[in-house]
Amino acid sequence: MPARTLEEIERVVRASWSVESCDPADAANWSPENPARGQCGSTALVLNDLLGGDLLTAEVHYPDGSRQGYHHWNRFGPGLEVDLTLEQFFATETVQEPRVMARPPQVGERVREQYLALRKAVYAALELDPNSP
């Protein structure tokens, strides 16, 4: 991969978000005004493709303690967490403590299309071979 800055990668990822790359569970809440909504899983996987590191996951809770869902982001080395989608959450949603998640050998069917859509857009914008690991 040609040398890229994290700032450049972040800009490209954010510009590539769309309803097509949104988690199906969040599609009804996705909008250009909240483009990060439902992008955390796809974004974390694409950043992991590009930069390696750990995948982090945490439950997201409503004020009554019930679970809204899960949130995913990245850690690169000790103390450097990158969460491009944290702003997606409403004030009533709280991200809990994270744990490291092993990357699945294959992306699950539920979000595979969304991940591939984001990966294709990001790799094209960065002029990378979409078939590279």
Walk through the language-model features, giving the residues of each:
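A structural boundary/capping signal
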Residues: M1-P133
